[in-house]
């Protein structure tokens, strides 16, 4: 599978990195909304999380079932070294593209 990242995949990985060890679906969605103003649907989130796990860019583990969740367990996510390296490569690519652009009124042309 490709180790390149789409924009939303990068956003998801960055949100998980920001949240640390306690990153789970709802907290990841909330972090993305807080930081980007974007409100990902649960379907888009979990499809992306599953794809990133298939690409070995993150791992997941099941927490303990809780009464507050009706006996269901949370699925926690952690970015792997492969995922971190992919984010760094993607950000470097963006930086390379931005280099040399002239700023007009504070925005890139």
Q: Which residue stretches match the model-derived regions?
A:
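N-terminal helix-turn-helix DNA-binding core of bacterial DNA-binding proteins
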Residues: 2-44
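Residue-level signal for threonine
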Residues: 6, 80-82
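Alpha-helical residues within the helix-turn-helix
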Residues: 30, 53-54
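Basic amphipathic alpha-helical segments that dock to polyanions
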Residues: 45-52
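Beta-hairpin "wing" of winged helix-turn-helix
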Residues: 55-70
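Exposed loop/turn and edge beta-strand positions of beta-sandwich/beta-sheet ligand-binding modules
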Residues: 73
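Amphipathic alpha-helical dimerization/coiled-coil segments
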Residues: 82-109
